[in-house]
Amino acid sequence: MDVTKTYVTIFVVAILTISVLIQIQQYDRCIGPCLRFYGNHQCYKNCRKAKYDGGQCDFVKKGEKLPECCCYYNKN
């Protein structure tokens, strides 16, 4: 009985953790393209001004010519 209860508890915790991680990822938001000379520092500063925890230049879609400045909230 104790082993079954332990497995059920682990399963429930895993499901809840996965659902929380999915919701956290929804907070990422791209606010515009990064120019070649733009760099992560400027993107980070713009995201901080927009009340996010930070940001970085990243290619969101395959084949894009310029990366996007994507802001995020810390996952902690």
Curated annotation (Swiss-Prot):
Signal peptide: 1-26
GO cellular component: extracellular region
Subcellular location: Secreted
Main location group: secreted
GO biological process terms, semicolon-separated: defense response to fungus; killing of cells of another organism
Swiss-Prot/TrEMBL keywords: Antimicrobial, Disulfide bond, Fungicide, Plant defense, Secreted, Signal
Domain of life: Eukaryota
Disulphide-bonded residues: C30-C71, C34-C57, C43-C69, C47-C70
InterPro entries hit by this protein: Defensin-like_dom
Family to which the UniProt record says this protein belongs: Belongs to the DEFL family.
Protein name, entry field: Putative defensin-like protein 62
Source organism (scientific name): Arabidopsis thaliana
